[in-house]
Design a protein with these regions (language model features):
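Boundary-proximal intrinsically disordered activation/regulatory segments immediately upstream
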Residues: 1-73, 160-161
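Short connector loops at helix/strand junctions that flank enzyme active sites
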Residues: 53, 100-102, 123
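RNA substrate-binding interface of SAM-dependent RNA methyltransferases
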Residues: 50, 77-80, 86-87, 91, ...
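Phosphate/diphosphate ligand-binding glycine-rich loop within oxidoreductases
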Residues: 67-101
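A generic structural signal for short beta-strands and their flanking turns/coil linkers
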Residues: 54, 103, 175-177
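Glycine-rich phosphate-binding loops that contact phosphosugars or nucleotide phosphates
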Residues: 107
């Protein structure tokens, strides 16, 4: 049975994730194990769930919950796991979040620990490096292209936008959950390790 809760109090603390906390705050750098992110649209949420990310709660437009088959299929995956599903009309959700929801659905999920880039290199031949790509839309578009080109992994320098930011994951159409990725300290670190890690492999650098 689904745990559906109609929104009747904008000040409810459980809605802070969607209404009052920034994405940077959700990362929770002081306690990464408690970090969260927001996925938008049934397609993106479905790919996050398939990749093993654990849902914390969902925010769904009433009409979409009744009429959208893709939304209903995602909600079926919440059966029996007691994930709160907050629901309201479109106008209420727009007022709460400050933007129009794509396909009327958001989901808060737990972040997974990032892999060490050296371990991630093993067995991978085609690796994309993003250097200081700060726009989440561009990060998402690059991930989508990387998926289309069958790239094996994506590495990002600290100046890049987080691939799990809502806009990045939405523009990527959920491919951020399909391609292994991690952050590296800087490109110099990668270059100095290149001969050790990939003596016969090419690195592609993409810049804004």
């Amino acid at each position: 049975m689904l745990n559906i809760l109609e929104i009747n109090d904008f000040a409810a603390p459980e809605l802070d994730i969607y209404a009052r906390r920034t994405e940077a705050q959700l990362i929770n750098k002081d306690n990464p194990e408690a970090g969260l992110f927001i996925a938008e649209s049934p397609k993106v949420i479905g790919r996050a769930l398939y990749a093993g990310y654990i849902p914390v709660s969902a925010l769904v437009e009433k009409h979409q919950m009744k009429e959208n088959e893709e939304t209903r299929q995602i909600l079926e995956r919440f059966e029996g796991i007691d994930v709160p599903i907050f629901t309201a009309e479109f106008e209420v959700l727009t007022k709460l979040t400050g933007f129009k929801l794509t396909r009327g659905m958001l989901c808060a999920l737990k972040r997974q620990p990032l892999m060490d880039y050296q371990n991630m290199c093993e067995g991978k031949d085609r690796i994309v490096i993003l250097e200081n790509v700060m726009n989440p839309t561009n990060v998402g578009a690059i991930f989508r292209s990387a998926a289309a080109l069958n790239m094996d992994a994506v590495f990002l320098t600290p100046g890049c936008s987080d691939p799990l930011y809502r806009r990045a994951s939405r523009v990527s159409m959920g491919t951020v959950f399909q391609i292994p990725w991690t952050f590296i300290q800087d490109n110099n670190e990668m270059r100095c390790q290149r001969e050790i890690l990939w003596p016969r492999q090419a690195i592609t650098e993409l810049r804004e």
